[in-house]
Amino acid sequence: MEAKAVARYIRISPRKVRQVVDLIRGKKLNEALAILRYTPKRASAVVAKVVRSAAANAENNLQMDRDELFIKACYVDQGPTYKRYMPRAFGRADVMRKRTSHITVVVSDKKEG
């Protein structure tokens, strides 16, 4: 069985979040949380929160054993982009793109194959 958790509209660029998510894919739950705890990136706290949420969903909704869980899948999709303007010289303006992310984590209790 598998359980999942999703965090949407997170105000961090998807490219930066993917660097963190790639570190934990396929790892055991406790190992993934330890990696995230010692990763010096802003996205690691958000990803850890989603991992803990997926584990709680597995425990409470599906009665799965927390010690058996591993990260089956985790991926980051791009959310909407906020456009802001920055004044430049000679009366011009540049568009600043504030990117958002949707983070999905799927945990499972047994490896397939």
Curated annotation (Swiss-Prot):
Cellular component GO terms, alphabetical: cytosolic large ribosomal subunit
InterPro entries linked to this entry: Ribosomal_uL22 (IPR001063), Ribosomal_uL22_bac/chlpt-type (IPR005727), Ribosomal_uL22_bac/org-type (IPR047867), Ribosomal_uL22_CS (IPR018260), Ribosomal_uL22_sf (IPR036394)
GO MF terms held by the record: rRNA binding; structural constituent of ribosome
PROSITE patterns assigned to the protein according to its UniProt record, in alphabetical order: RIBOSOMAL_L22 (PS00464)
Protein origin, superkingdom: Bacteria
PANTHER family in alphabetical order: CHLOROPLAST 50S RIBOSOMAL PROTEIN L22-RELATED (PTHR13501), LARGE RIBOSOMAL SUBUNIT PROTEIN UL22M (PTHR13501:SF8)
Role: This protein binds specifically to 23S rRNA; its binding is stimulated by other ribosomal proteins, e.g. L4, L17, and L20. It is important during the early stages of 50S assembly. It makes multiple contacts with different domains of the 23S rRNA in the assembled 50S subunit and ribosome. The globular domain of the protein is located near the polypeptide exit tunnel on the outside of the subunit, while an extended beta-hairpin is found that lines the wall of the exit tunnel in the center of the 70S ribosome.
Similarity annotation: Belongs to the universal ribosomal protein uL22 family.
Name of the protein described by the UniProt record: Large ribosomal subunit protein uL22
Protein source organism: Pelotomaculum thermopropionicum (strain DSM 13744 / JCM 10971 / SI)
